């Protein structure tokens, strides 16, 4: 089966369910790996479900970006193994964007593993009822991002100062120390738009957190 729009073509193999994508000119963009959709029965807390794995075939020199914020110092996520689960200093976003002009949003809320190697790229989710993802095709990177915003919702821009210079450390011991750092920045005429208090500024009793006093 072949489905066409003004931007892309999608082909579905009815014998094995494999899906491939191409742009309007017929240039291949992405294809599911042969036998790349796998369902493994699992049970959590008495609930029966499936661990779902979906594999794709990428070009050898194709760069992909995204997947959140991870502490491995990489922007291009080729040949990486990532746990897509929220953690301290780790932000998981199961979305990637390719230099070939497409984005892929893996639609699953359970802990997920992303892997890429010379053979295939794959998402594996611990619990799912199906292999669910969105393929976004655009002429430019901005257009692909617009399609993602159409899916997730439009977000207002932050205040201008939030895009400025920030100072942070682990951690300031007192309000006096924090304000002293700001004062020093001003004395040196070094730009500073925000400073991060970080943890423990709320004291030992969270129920009585003081919003106007550094109470640790």
Pin down the residues of each PLM region.
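Catalytic and substrate-binding clefts that recognize carbohydrates or anionic sugar/phosphate headgroups
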Residues: 2-160, 169-171, 175-176, 182-187
């Amino acid at each position: 089966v072949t489905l066409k729009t003004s931007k892309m073509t999608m082909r579905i193999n009815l014998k094995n369910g494999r899906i491939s994508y191409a742009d309007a000119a017929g240039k291949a963009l992405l294809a599911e790996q042969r036998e790349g959709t796998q369902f493994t029965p699992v049970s959590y807390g008495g609930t029966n479900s499936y661990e779902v794995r979906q594999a794709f075939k990428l070009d050898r020199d194709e760069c992909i970006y995204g997947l959140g914020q991870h502490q491995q110092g990489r922007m291009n996520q080729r040949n990486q193994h990532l746990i897509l689960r929220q953690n301290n200093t780790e932000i998981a976003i199961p979305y990637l964007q390719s230099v070939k002009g497409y984005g892929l949003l893996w639609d699953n809320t359970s802990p997920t593993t992303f892997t890429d190697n010379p053979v295939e790229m794959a998402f594996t989710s611990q619990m799912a009822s199906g292999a669910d993802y969105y393929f976004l095709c655009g002429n430019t990177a901005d257009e692909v991002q617009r399609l993602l915003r159409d899916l997730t919702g439009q977000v207002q821009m932050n205040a201008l100062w939030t895009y400025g210079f920030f100072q942070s450390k682990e951690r300031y011991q007192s309000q006096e120390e924090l304000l002293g750092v700001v004062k020093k920045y001003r004395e040196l005429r070094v730009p500073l738009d925000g400073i991060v208090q970080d943890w423990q500024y709320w004291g030992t009793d969270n129920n009585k957190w003081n919003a106007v006093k550094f109470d640790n």
